[in-house]
């Protein structure tokens, strides 16, 4: 009844619901990480701390199992390729769309947002048919997986960079142009430094999405050499998985968290000095 009397107030049960959600989301991950360091093959009973499944076991550990190593390397390869292509292309598209005011600009903006709302299974099937029937000379494998991941990660870069463009406004560009700076100097010495926080953040998001992706990557996979960590975990989960899979997932998780942490500190550094950067660029 108190909530009905004041519907705009914060419900008292909201902190409890939030805590339960966080607990439900985090606990399974913590348990999976914990059993990656279990000395036994058991996934239910703890028998002591060990690095056996990372490098100690000479046949089943991540360090000694070629299949686990190959999945991790291929996952990181796809993530690096996706970031290297999606981020520059997304920044270019964001700059172009932000300045395009002609006919059809609204339709293009809607098309750029479609990958964000399209179910992954629909996108995966569509891309599979595309590579099998139209671009069959490319075939399935690393190239198809990279193109597939770029297809849905590109929109994230465009949205984040355009948001940054809207927030900084056109004033810095106009001031640089008024001071006689040529267009390439305005772009590389004024605009891109101001966009660097959004570019870094979008790169981190694309990296995490690439490592996490399963559906599109699974549909576009070729032979065993194009297996990723998520695909390997899914294929092994229904069998008799060893804690080495927990170790593999833990490594992938810490790589992602380490990347996000690094980007966060770099972002703080850029964001903290963005005004000084812009002023210095204008003075030059």
Regions found by a protein language model. Name each.
Residues 12, 99-108, 137-142, 183, ...:
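Membrane-helix interface segments
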């Amino acid at each position: 009844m108190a909530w009905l009397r004041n519907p705009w107030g914060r419900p008292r049960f909201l902190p409890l619901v939030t805590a339960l959600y966080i607990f439900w989301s985090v606990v399974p991950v913590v348990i999976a990480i914990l059993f990656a360091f279990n000395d036994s093959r058991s996934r239910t009973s703890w028998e002591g701390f060990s690095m056996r499944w990372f490098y100690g076991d000479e046949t089943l550990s991540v360090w000694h199992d070629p299949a686990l190593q190959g999945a991790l390397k291929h996952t990181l390869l796809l993530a690096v390729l996706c970031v290297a292509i999606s981020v520059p292309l997304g920044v270019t598209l964001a700059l172009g769309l932000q300045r395009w005011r002609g006919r059809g600009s609204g339709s293009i903006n809607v098309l750029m947002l479609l990958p964000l709302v399209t179910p992954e299974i629909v996108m995966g099937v569509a891309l599979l048919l595309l590579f099998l029937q139209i671009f069959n000379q490319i075939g399935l494998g690393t190239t198809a997986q990279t193109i597939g991941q770029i297809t849905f990660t590109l929109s994230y870069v465009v949205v984040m960079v355009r948001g940054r463009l809207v927030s900084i406004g056109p004033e810095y560009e106009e001031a640089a142009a008024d001071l006689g700076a040529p267009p390439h100097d305005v772009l590389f010495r004024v605009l891109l430094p101001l966009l660097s926080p959004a570019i870094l953040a979008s790169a981190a998001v694309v990296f995490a999405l690439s490592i996490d992706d399963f559906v599109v990557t699974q549909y576009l996979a070729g032979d065993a050499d194009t297996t990723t960590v998520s695909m390997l975990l899914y294929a092994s989960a229904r069998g008799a998985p060893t804690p080495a899979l927990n170790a593999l997932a833990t490594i992938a998780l810490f790589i992602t968290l380490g990347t996000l942490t690094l980007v966060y500190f770099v972002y703080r550094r850029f964001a903290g000095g963005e005004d000084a950067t812009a002023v210095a660029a204008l003075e030059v």
